[in-house]
């Protein structure tokens, strides 16, 4: 799952 964190960075999780 790809999502934006609260700072606006792109993160990849399971």
Curated annotation (Swiss-Prot):
Query: What else is on record for this protein?
Result: On the 2D-gel the determined pI of this unknown protein is: 5.4, its MW is: 38.2 kDa.
Question: What is the protein named?
Answer: Unknown protein CP 46 from 2D-PAGE
Specify the species.
Answer: Clostridium pasteurianum
The upper taxonomy is:
Bacteria, Bacillati, Bacillota, Clostridia, Eubacteriales
